[in-house]
Amino acid sequence: MIRFVLDTSIFVNPDVRKKFGETPTKAMKTFLKYAESLFGHVEFYMPPGIYREVMHFVEEEEVSPDIELYIIKKPPNVHDIKIPAFVVYELIEDIRRRVDKGLRVAEKAVRESVIDTSNVDKIIQKLRRNYRKALREGILDSKEDFELILLAKELDGIIVSADVGILTWAEKMGIKWVDAFKFKEVLEELVEKLKRSESEKERK
């Protein structure tokens, strides 16, 4: 049984979502059609935190009861999952590097504001943008992201995400993943393979 563990990006990230639909609700409805075609052969999971995030953007009445049937909400078993010590070491080292990088971004902004006192507001905006990028890009920056990683580890599932931080840490922990930008094509191929398999069985 193939198990996919889904991130919010499929339905919320505009660049990814447009392959499934113009709005989060339309994207979810398209996805659920694929899930229906693959029912019994492929399972789709979401940690509860991720599910709640997605449902902030999706009109529930338009996707019920299918969403309850085809997306399994499951928290990771945080008490029994073992995480290698090297992961903690890498996380600590990554945080240290990011703090140093954030300090350099702040120092640069201070120097610019001293030289150009007339553009302090623009410099602050630039500081916030660069500081956020230095500290958050490519890292697990929320409890929900970590739950996604843990659940995929527990299920030996395949993470589907466009988040660089999630995919980076999936690789570090030996977890299979699919880039969300290619997920629709993956689903289409799975549906086609299932149809061919069923057709061959009928001929026999």
From Swiss-Prot:
<comment type="similarity">
    <text>Belongs to the HARP family.</text>
</comment>
<keyword id="KW-0255">Endonuclease</keyword>
<dbReference type="GO" id="GO:0004526">
    <property type="term" value="F:ribonuclease P activity"/>
</dbReference>
<dbReference type="Pfam" id="PF08745">
    <property type="entry name" value="PIN_5"/>
</dbReference>
<dbReference type="GO" id="GO:0001682">
    <property type="term" value="P:tRNA 5'-leader removal"/>
</dbReference>
<keyword id="KW-0378">Hydrolase</keyword>
<keyword id="KW-0540">Nuclease</keyword>
<dbReference type="InterPro" id="IPR029060">
    <property type="entry name" value="PIN-like_dom_sf"/>
</dbReference>
<protein>
    <recommendedName>
        <fullName>RNA-free ribonuclease P</fullName>
        <ecNumber>3.1.26.5</ecNumber>
    </recommendedName>
</protein>
<dbReference type="InterPro" id="IPR014856">
    <property type="entry name" value="RNA_free_RNase_P"/>
</dbReference>
<comment type="function">
    <text>RNA-free RNase P that catalyzes the removal of the 5'-leader sequence from pre-tRNA to produce the mature 5'-terminus.</text>
</comment>
<keyword id="KW-0819">tRNA processing</keyword>
